[in-house]
Amino acid sequence: MKITWLGHAAFRLDFAGTAVLIDPFLTHNPVFKGDVAEVSKGVSHILLTHGHSDHIGDTAGIVKAAEAEGRKVIVVANPEVCGFLSGQGLSAFEPMNTGGTVKLDGFSVTMVRADHSSGGDGSNPTYLGNPNGLIVKAAGEPTLWHLGDTDLFSDMALISEIHQPKVAIVPIGDRFTMGPETAALAVRRFISAETVVPCHYGTFPLLVPDASGFVAALQGHSAKVVVPNSGESFEV
């Protein structure tokens, strides 16, 4: 599996001839320096953890650009987010919710708990369902857990026990999610992954600017901490 960090909580996964995007907040993401068309090339699915604009991001634009090329990109999200995006002209969805699993073309996605909120922006925000983390599984590939936006909770241990993730993508930015020390505690205490990737930091002034505190808090822990630059890929 090749994992590419696109800044904030956005990632591209390439595995077994499949390419998916998670939370593709790109155009208005100051950390993303790439080209939206390039990073979405060949993508078959977009997986969304929740309905905040810094996670839905470029979903509608990517799907419509693919349709103009004769390709279909399917959005995997909770029903409320699917409904919201249908109002933007999208029609190809795999709706699901917390605890459920959807089997797709050569891989599966399971939604798991995240402690956060989920709604549209503005003075009268739209309710967009519950936030979630995502478990991505494919035969012969390491299981990946994108935690979404969340605080620490002890049932992370149960999620680890059930799904046995080898890779965990963990928010560390503080204020809106766990901060570095709490995220490191989650990894030490509850998350069994062999490889840990921090995200949701350095995007805006309100967030922790870098991953150094997270890395320091995990010194001596068995998990490998990978801190890619925006646009950088690594393989697991």
Curated annotation (Swiss-Prot):
Keyword Methyltransferase belongs to the record: no
Any Pfam family hit: Lactamase_B_2
Gene3D superfamilies: Ribonuclease Z/Hydroxyacylglutathione hydrolase-like
InterPro entries: Metallo-B-lactamas (IPR001279), RibonucZ/Hydroxyglut_hydro (IPR036866), UPF0173 (IPR022877), UPF0173_UPF0282_UlaG_hydrolase (IPR050114)
Transmembrane segments: none
GO MF assignments: hydrolase activity
Domain of life: Bacteria
Family label: Belongs to the UPF0173 family.
The protein's name: UPF0173 metal-dependent hydrolase AZC_2841
Gene source species: Azorhizobium caulinodans (strain ATCC 43989 / DSM 5975 / JCM 20966 / LMG 6465 / NBRC 14845 / NCIMB 13405 / ORS 571)
